């Protein structure tokens, strides 16, 4: 079965999730929602999913278009408000969190606030929401980007929106892991070379000799993806 970056990234993210974890995703998180469902169906049936709307263990029939879709509240085990959510995070109750970012630096700090001088920005971005609070409080954070280039992976952020317990970064080229406070390539995706990653990263990044390749999606994984996302929403962030 054929696959592309959307399927490969969703699978790579899903495989990082563990059974029994409480997992949260932020706003605009189509791929994380797909990864969470994939993990629940195939290897983590006891995973607890808390979405940005406050729904606990939502079970939508198909992948919603938005991470705030009403389908993520219907039939849930419960709904928590924002105060309860932040209290949960600060108590260490969130095991894994998915978060996106516009810029990522070598230490896996993120910028989702501005491009350019903060006093006179070239671009004003949506902002980090609660990222500054939850990144250092969640037990581990998985960052994801659907474009891997020198504009995204920069030596110095234009603004530090959030920093914290980032464990891995998943992109269309590779999976990175933070080692001794700095990002390094853990796995190269099929067909991607170390040179391609270095050329598209705006800071020196370690790619170990004999770096393993991300195993391609299995037929079972692809079947679940296509059943849960028949409208191919997973491709929207790659356009």
Q: Where does each model-flagged region fall?
A:
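N-terminal active-site beta-alpha-beta segment that forms phosphate/nucleotide-binding
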Residues: 1-75
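N-terminal charge/polar-biased segments
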Residues: 1-11, 15, 211-239
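Short secondary-structure junctions and interdomain/linker hinges
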Residues: 20, 204-208, 232-236
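Alpha-helix boundary/capping detector
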Residues: 51, 134, 223-227
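Conserved phosphate- and dinucleotide-binding cores of soluble alpha/beta proteins
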Residues: 62-220
């Amino acid at each position: 079965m054929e696959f592309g970056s959307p399927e490969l990234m969703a699978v790579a993210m899903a495989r990082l999730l563990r059974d029994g974890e409480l997992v949260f995703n932020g706003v605009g998180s189509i791929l994380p929602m797909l990864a969470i469902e994939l993990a629940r169906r195939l290897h983590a049936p006891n995973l607890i999913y808390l979405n940005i709307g406050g729904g606990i263990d939502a079970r939508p029939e198909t992948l919603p278009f938005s991470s705030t879709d009403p389908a993520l509240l219907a039939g849930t085990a419960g709904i928590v408000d924002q105060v309860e959510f932040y209290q949960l995070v600060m108590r260490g109750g969130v095991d894994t969190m998915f978060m996106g970012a516009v810029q990522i630096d070598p230490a896996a700090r993120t910028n989702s606030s501005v491009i350019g001088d903060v006093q006179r920005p070239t671009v004003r971005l949506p902002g980090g929401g609660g990222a500054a609070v939850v990144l250092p409080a969640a037990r581990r954070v998985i960052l994801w980007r659907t474009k891997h280039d020198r504009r995204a992976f920069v030596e110095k952020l234009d603004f530090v929106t959030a920093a914290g317990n980032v464990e891995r970064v998943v992109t269309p080229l590779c999976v990175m892991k933070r080692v001794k406070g700095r990002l390094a390539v853990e796995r190269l995706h099929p067909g991607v070379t170390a040179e391609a990653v270095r050329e598209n990263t705006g800071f020196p990044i370690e790619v170990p000799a004999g770096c393993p390749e991300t195993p391609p999606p299995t037929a079972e994984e692809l079947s679940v993806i296509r059943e849960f996302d028949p409208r191919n929403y997973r491709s929207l962030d790659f356009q």
